[in-house]
Structures are given as C-alpha cells and as structure tokens.
Amino acid sequence: MLLADVNLFIYAHRPESPRFDEHKAWLTTALSGDEPFGISEQILSGFLRIVTNHRVFRDPTPPDVALDFCQTVLTAPSAVRIRPGREHWRIFENLCRELGARGNVIPDAFLAAMAIEVGATFITTDAGFARFPGLRWRRPFDTNPGRR
C-alpha cells in the first residue's frame, strides 16, 4: 500500500508546481494501479488548507475546484481510506519521544505513524521523513522504498 503526503497532491494539482506534469501523471497512474493507494482525510484537509490559501498562492484554487479534486482522489479505483487505528497513538507517541519531536515535526510524526501502522510506503518529496524509524518512504519517482 502507498500513502501520499500532502505535497504530492499539491504538486499534482497546481500547474506552477515543480515537475507538475510528472507529479500529475504519477498520481493518476498510482490512483488507477493495482497497488492500494491509502487516502487520509487529514492529508486531504491539509491539501485544501494550502491550495485555497491566498497567503500561499497569488491565485488560490477555488474551494469547489479543490473539493472536486479531493472527490476524484477519494473515488479513484485504487483508493482506500486510511484512518488512525488502535495502535496509531502508541506508534505516534513512541516516534515523538524517540525523536524529541516538537513543533512542525509533530504532524509529520502523526502521518509517519499512520503509514507505519498500516504497513504503507509513504510517498513524499520531503526527505525529512527519513528521520522516522520504521517508516518505509520514497520520493514519487524513485522505485526503491527506504527504511529508516
């Protein structure tokens, strides 16, 4: 199973994003592939928060357009909704304690714990996720997941 970070959705949605065409093609292929693609509502809400924000984008995405994008993702053939389960908090707490996590590392630890709990490979352009022990992660165009 794959679980994508918010940056993948942003880069596949906003044409001015780095490597937009490649990210869009990657996401389209992944969402229609054979491997289950985990969708976290928390990650999608982060996508909505960022792409509709006029402080982030001069011309932010209209909310209806952003919500339609989310609906397309949620109803894709490979999409599987992922929510924190019974072990999530324990994994999250252990990651936070082990790393002395604070500030902006906390939400990343929360997502890493979700991926670890369901055994997903976390797809992100943020190499900072390498800090989380037990997390399999990779960049979208890499084929070999790293285990850190």
Task: Please describe what each predicted stretch is.
Residues 38-41, 125:
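Short beta-strand segments at enzyme active-site cores
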Residues 1, 112-148:
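Acidic, PIN/NYN-like endoribonuclease modules and their adjacent C-terminal/linker elements
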Residues 78-123:
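Active-site neighborhoods of divalent-metal-dependent phosphate/nucleic-acid chemistry enzymes
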Residues 1-39, 55-68, 118, 146-147:
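Short, well-structured N-terminal submotif of metal-dependent ribonuclease cores
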Residues 54-57, 99-100, 140-143:
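Short, hinge-like loop/turn segments at secondary-structure boundaries
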Residues 39-40, 60, 81-84, 141:
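Short, hydrophobic secondary-structure boundary micro-motifs
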Residues 8, 43, 87-88, 110-111, ...:
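Alpha-helix capping/helix-boundary segments
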